[in-house]
Amino acid sequence: MKKILVLAPHTDDGECGCGGSIVKFIEEEADVYYVGFSSAKKSIPKGFPQNATEEEFKKATHTLGLSKNNLILFDYEVRNFPAVRQDILEDMVKLNKDIAPDIILMPSFNDTHQDHSVIASESFRAFKSASILGYEMPYNNITLNANVFIFLTELQIKKKLMALECYKSQKMRMRGGIDFFENLAKVRGIQIGTKYAECFEIIRWIIK
């Protein structure tokens, strides 16, 4: 059974970038882990409780089919990852020892958000024996060398959209709304002759 580790700088990044693929991998009986590094408490709008994103994270990942035993949520401060990159690296090294993942799904090296950039660069250092794919974050990517596409069914995309709907506190930050992600999946699907897909770029691929 393949072990797949999703690295999300903030809660909801994994759902945005590879939520459909997470559903697909779980359906194919892969052992999928999801690690969020920040619940972005400072970005929670007024009117929502301070634990809003933590609770939304639990609901969203449950919607995707993830086991709660395969979830980890750290408490790093949003937009401050560059100042604590060594701590983040050490957490990743421990994750590598504890989980020994075969495949990492993480932000692209071309992601301009400072927190996403730290996760990408430190992941490359920490998970030296794992294959690594960078997922698409259209809001932040300068470019994306989309050289891996994953076929997705309509139901898998629906589960991704349902997971994103769980993040009530973040709706105003989703430019284009939830429909944007459905339309993006359609565009990626058209590129490879199917209805829906998600794309990734190969950072490192290991054949054992």
Labelled PLM ranges:
Residues 150-170, 175-180, 185-186:
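A conserved mid-domain beta-alpha-beta active-site/ligand-binding segment of alpha/beta enzyme cores
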Residues 1-131, 165, 180, 184-188, ...:
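Active-site beta-strand->loop->alpha-helix modules in alpha/beta enzyme cores, enriched
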Residues 130-151:
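Short, flexible loop segments at boundaries between secondary-structure elements
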Residues 36, 73-75, 134, 149-151, ...:
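Structural signal for conserved beta-strand scaffold positions within catalytic alpha/beta enzyme cores
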Residues 193-208:
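Short, basic/aromatic-enriched C-terminal tail that caps enzymatic domains
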Residues 78-82, 140-142, 156-157:
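A short acidic, often aromatic-flanked loop/helix-cap motif at beta-alpha or helix-coil junctions
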Residues 129, 153-155, 205:
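Short loop segments at secondary-structure junctions
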Residues 120-123, 148-152:
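Short, surface-exposed, charged loop/turn segments at secondary-structure junctions
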